[in-house]
């Protein structure tokens, strides 16, 4: 059972923006083109050390678990690579903060944050945590690869 992601404005930005050190910012346009309805554009930036602390998605999961009884509950979150893709690869004017002048430090902090994420969901009773990753499509498209 899932919550259908109905509490979210965006399938990916809401989770990532609530990580410590990450901020949601307004944007004039999306870095990808949507067909049909065009939601308000937004993006993310890394403003400080990336980490995992208090996060509203844990409460979302706990609520789902409380109403699901013995039914297995699935929680979905964006993969760690989505944070890097949005903040560093797709960002038109990406300038790393002082802490992340060496990209290895960013990768390390993202990895540690996600270890904490997975542990926190596990400790809350989550046994089905799905990491959604649409970044693979970026590398399968020859036109997208040219931009990197």
Mark where each language-model region is.
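Domain-level signal for soluble alpha/beta catalytic cores
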Residues: 1-148
